[in-house]
Amino acid sequence: VLSTGSGNVRSAVRALERVGAQVTLTHDPGRVAEADGLVVPGVGAFGAVMDQLRAVDAPRLIEQRLAGGRPVLGICVGMQVMFDRSEEHGTAEEGLGQWPGTVRRLQADIVPHMGWSQVRPPRDSVLFDGVAEERFYFVHSYAATEDPAELLGPGPTRLPRATWATHGQDFIAAVENGALC
């Protein structure tokens, strides 16, 4: 688990340990590079999480892992920063650019979205294997709402596959894209 000072790091560590994972909390470049998988947690404002990631050279470390086909999982804002940018709090903030798209405020009667929502994963989802069409708990005010595969269009690259949920509008709950989820 990437250590950045983010508020939900301990929750991510405990959840992974509960399902039997051997977890190391680190931002050491060697350990990040050698890990079987890397979890990028994040809670709070998009810009603050990007600042935390830059402070530990995480953009470069994540890029190196992905270039080598090594798994990376973003959770919460850790997933949102994988998109091109955010318009959180009316300020344009650059993300890591792994997926095209912009994270924007949800268009719903009640924001933040705090509650259970059913997810709709793509067919043959690896990430949601065995839990397709289940309900998951969300706490967020911002989300990407444009399918990254549609923004990319046809080409030689493997297209990202979005899992969707709804709160006032459809939003991306997760993305599977080879080694990046």
Question: Positions of the model-derived regions?
Answer:
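N-terminal beta1-alpha1 ligand-phosphate binding loop
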Residues: 1-21
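Structural alpha-helical scaffold elements that stabilize or flank donor/cofactor-binding regions
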Residues: 31-32, 65
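An anion/phosphate-binding loop that grips the pyrophosphate of nucleotide cofactors and donors
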Residues: 35
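Cysteine-nucleophile active-site neighborhood
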Residues: 44-116
